[in-house]
UniProtKB/Swiss-Prot annotation:
Residues 331-360, 841-850 have a biased composition (Basic and acidic residues). GO terms for molecular function: DNA binding. The keyword Transcription regulation applies. Pfam families: Mating_N. It comes from Schizophyllum commune (Split gill fungus). Belongs to the TALE/M-ATYP homeobox family. Residues 542-559, 612-650 have a biased composition (Low complexity). Residues 111-189 bind DNA. Specifies A-alpha-3 mating-type. May regulate the expression of genes specific to the homokaryotic cell type. This is Mating-type protein A-alpha Z3. InterPro entries: Mating-type_A-alpha/beta_1_N. Residues 331-592, 606-671, 779-812, 836-861 are annotated as: Disordered.
Length: 891
């Protein structure tokens, strides 16, 4: 129930006093105040109109109560901490005092034991006999007389006291010791207080306490073992009334007769309950037994060491020689089995290392040179033979891993990563591989069983060689890694971790590789790699391609290549495809620049008209202003649809895919790829200012894309230039002749620069200017026709490897394009100064002064720096691929 404004003011006025009173009364009052406070808060937070003074009063009261509660909580926490500290200190002092007392007592005990005289030898035997005869601690002086037997021991006095009798001269010492022992354990005191000094009654009560049944008692004669020689009734049917417990009564439980029993059997005497002693007498006997056990416990009981030695030391006759021999034989057999297991494990490790080497050999990397000329000749012969075989097999195959690159843009090509076979074929290969592995495991088990059945006399092989071999492999791998870092490698991009690739070993045959023409996956970005939810690296884009007609052996399938689109000089043609830009609010969009081509006119005709004159371009552009461009907006990466754009200008077919979506099969007949423009004089609409003037890059974002004469809003603001997809021509590159083609190398000898799919984004400042960071450029540099890997004839650990000579680092064509395009500001070339022949340092000083005067670097410096960046990026990419390949094969 909500309160009114007057009630709220009254409650706020007394809130602090009520809170303090509730704290003083107890928890129940605090709960009541909390309930009232909740109602007050709900009333204030409701829609009830309140005066500003009321709201101000509520704020002041709430802040005051909050501060007070915080102070009380802090004080309670401090009190709790102080209480805990005091209790911990008291407990620590108590433990310390106990430890000190225990230490002092142990020291005093040790001193007391050291000062004690030695125990006579006969006391041990007498004490043991006393503990076993507490029901009658009166030994006889004659060997034939024995005390009453007890359930604990049935031995007589003669054998038990024989050591004591042998060590003492008279019986007086034993009698005096037994008299003192009976006094110490309280036998005499119990006899005087409980039984009035009557030893016979004391012995009878002790028999009831520690003795046996009545039948055994009738057969014994207590008078023979008693020192007092008093006449004792040999047979007692009942216990005197003063020995019985006043709380217990003798009761008989009559057994019910059964039907098959005879009448004579039914009238049998019921069993008699055992007699009971008075509780005080039983307690006195129990205390006496305890004192008897504690009398010489600290002197005569064996220590823990004696118990351990006695338990572990077995007599020799108890050991069975046959069992000992069997145990020794089993231990030897287990040792041999362990040695064989270690041998098989070392063999498996060597096989795994060899498998990794073979898998690593399937990817191109620089071959280490050798000082031995014979080995170089053998390697060259094997390389040439393999290249010829590879070229023949590639010509016969329908689909090849090579791509068709146009002559002007061969330097922009990059190695692609594609699926090696169809999904169905890969599934069958996986089944076959699993079956082969199971067969290998079965054969390995059979071999291990045969090895275990061999003679036990054969010593296990030494495993030191395997360790030395592993060290040699490690040294060889380190040397190979050093050589790889010294020279720039060729390499192919591996598929994503989710690609169903199965690596199968072959005895003397290099694994074959097939490329599916209808399924292509772009390479993953360099490290660090961001993985998607399904395990596929972000940036992997499935794309549609068209299978080229296999008219000749040199026909190749079209490939999607990714690079930075930069304005190239007139000697090179401009990419005839779309670009991808990023901006707000759409993270990834596909901007189809082909929309600038008017309807009813082909791209070639339009570019011819554009190249002829500038006014014609403006007219053609304005004539097609009514045609709207198609923009694909997806929440993630959009497929490179510019490759699949048809001849129609107003349509742009796009396929929206997720960045983490795995590649799927696409029929080759679904799209049609338009051949690029081969003329070098044509200008792409991307670099046409008239086309750029039709777009408003500064307008706010909306849902549609508009293009017209006026400045209309666009659906994005192109602030970053990302990548460009280029559909290269079907003509092969000049570097890919049949004599140098190889399956192990998917890049031409003059390799292409590569840019990261994610991180090579440059800022677009104008339609003709863009800037890129130095760390965003990567490249694949070539090392000549011997860049491919050939099968090693000898293991790397046994070959003499010498470091390869450093080759001069030459920048790729991308560096020249960047410098010649004007995107990078460099200083002009300095006119060389003629220096006197005598002064060799004059030219250097003049060059340094000239370089200090100019804030920009020379083109040679920029070119050298970019070449170094490309080389370093290629090395890092090679190391990343090597680590990814090792992780994929389980190494």
């Amino acid at each position: 129930m909500l309160l009114g404004e007057e009630d709220i003011i009254q409650a706020l006025s007394t809130a602090q006093t009520d809170f303090l009173d509730a704290l003083a009364e107890g928890p129940e009052a605090v709960l009541t105040f909390q309930t009232r406070w909740g109602v007050l808060r709900a009333s204030i937070d409701s829609d009830l109109p309140l005066q500003p003074s009321t709201l101000e009063l509520s704020d002041r009261v709430s802040y005051a109560i909050a501060d007070l509660a915080e102070v009380l909580l802090t004080q309670e926490a401090n009190n709790k901490a102080i209480e805990d500290d005091l209790s911990n200190d008291l407990v620590a002092q108590f433990h310390q005092y106990e430890a000190f007392e225990a230490l002092e007592f142990s020291e005093n005990d040790c001193e007391w034991q050291e000062n004690m005289p030695p125990v006579p030898p006969f006391i041990g035997a007498c004490y043991e006999w006393l503990l076993q005869h507490l029901h009658n601690p009166y030994p006889s002086n004659e060997g034939r007389l024995t005390p009453p037997s007890s359930p604990r021991s049935a031995c007589s006095i003669l054998p038990s006291l024989k050591p004591a009798l042998d060590t003492c001269k008279t019986f007086d010492d034993i009698d005096r010791w037994f008299s003192a022992a009976r006094i110490r354990i309280g036998w005499t005191h119990i006899c005087d207080t409980k039984f009035g000094g009557d030893k016979a009654m004391m012995l009878e009560a002790a028999r009831v306490m520690w003795g046996s049944s009545d039948e055994e008692y009738e057969e014994r004669n207590f008078a023979a073992g008693c020192v007092s020689r008093r006449s004792v009734s040999p047979k007692r049917e009942e216990i005197p009334s003063y020995l019985k417990s006043p709380h217990d009564s003798i009761a008989f439980q009559a057994r019910l007769p059964e039907a098959h029993e005879e009448p004579a059997e039914r009238h049998c005497t019921p069993p008699r309950e055992p007699p009971c002693l008075d509780p005080d007498v039983e307690l006195a006997f129990a205390c006496m037994e305890t004192r008897a056990h504690e009398m010489y416990a600290h002197r005569l009981e064996p220590s823990e060491l004696v118990d351990t030695l006695s338990a572990s030391a077995l007599p020799r006759e108890a050991v069975n020689d046959v069992e000992c021999q069997e145990a020794i034989a089993r231990a030897a057999h287990e040792k041999r089995q362990q040695a064989r297991r270690e041998q098989r494990q070392a063999k498996n490790e060597r096989d795994a290392a060899q498998m990794r080497e073979e898998q690593r050999a399937s990817y191109p990397s620089p071959e280490p040179s050798s000082d031995d000329e014979g080995e170089d000749e053998d390697d060259e012969e094997s390389t040439d033979a393999y290249d010829s075989e590879a070229s023949d097999s590639e010509d016969d195959s329908d689909s090849d891993t090579d791509s068709h690159y146009s002559q002007p843009f061969a330097s922009y090509a990059r190695g692609r990563t594609s699926f090696l076979s169809d999904v169905s074929a890969l599934a069958d290969d996986e089944d076959e591989a699993s079956d082969d592995d199971e067969d290998d495991n079965v054969e390995g088990d059979d071999e291990s069983e045969e090895e275990e059945e061999e003679e036990d006399t054969t010593p296990p092989p030494k495993l030191a060689g395997s360790k030395r071999r592993a060290d040699e492999d490690i040294d060889g791998q380190a040397e190979e890694k050093r050589l790889r870092s010294a020279s720039v490698p060729h390499f192919m991009y591996p598929p994503s971790p989710k690609s169903p690739m199965v690596v199968k070993r072959a005895a003397h045959k290099r694994p074959t590789r097939r490329a599916s023409p209808s399924l292509i996956r772009l390479s993953p970005p360099p490290a660090p790699v961001t993985m998607g939810p399904d395990g596929v690296p972000l940036g992997t884009v499935p794309s549609k391609t068209t299978k080229a007609p296999a008219s000749t052996s040199t026909t190749k399938s079209s490939t999607v290549q990714v690079h930075i689109p930069l304005p190239a000089p007139s000697s090179r043609s401009i990419p005839s495809s779309g670009i991808k830009v990023t901006g707000d609010p759409t993270p990834w969009v596909n901007w189809d620049l082909n929309a600038a081509v008017p309807c009813g006119q082909s791209k070639a005709e339009y570019l011819d008209s554009v190249g002829s004159s500038r006014p014609q371009r403006r007219a053609s552009t304005s004539s097609s202003s009514s045609t709207s461009s198609s923009l694909s907006r997806t929440p993630s990466l959009t497929s490179l649809s510019s490759l699949s754009s048809g001849s129609s200008v107003s349509t742009c077919e796009t396929v929206g895919t997720d960045s983490s979506e795995p590649a799927v099969h696409v029929q080759a007949s679904e799209t049609a790829t338009e051949a690029p423009i081969k003329s070098a004089a044509h200008v792409h609409p991307l670099f046409n200012p008239d086309v750029w003037s039709q777009y408003n890059l500064d307008a706010t974002a909306d849902v549609e894309f508009h293009r017209g004469k006026g400045r209309k809003a666009s659906s994005f603001r192109p602030a970053k230039l990302l990548v460009e997809a280029v559909d290269l021509s079907t003509s092969p590159s000049q570097h890919w002749t049949p004599s140098v083609r190889s399956r192990t190398r998917l890049a031409p000898s003059v390799a292409a620069p590569v840019t990261s799919y994610h991180h090579a984004a440059g800022t677009v400042t104008s339609p003709i200017e863009s800037s890129f960071g130095q760390g965003q450029l990567t490249s694949i540099l070539s090392t000549g026709p011997k860049a491919g890997i050939t099968r090693r004839q000898t293991p790397p650990a046994k070959r003499r490897v010498s470091p390869r000579a450093q080759e001069p680092v030459e920048p790729s064509s991308l560096v020249d394009d960047i410098i010649s395009s004007g995107l990078v500001v460099v200083c002009k070339e300095i006119t060389p100064v003629k220096a006197p022949k005598k002064d060799r340092r004059y030219a250097e000083r003049a060059e340094r002064r000239a370089s200090k005067a100019n804030s920009f670097d020379s083109p040679d410096t920029v070119r050298a720096r970019l070449a170094e960046i490309e080389q370093e990026a290629a090395r890092l990419e090679a190391e990343r691929l090597s680590l990814q390949r090792i992780a994929s094969v389980g190494g």
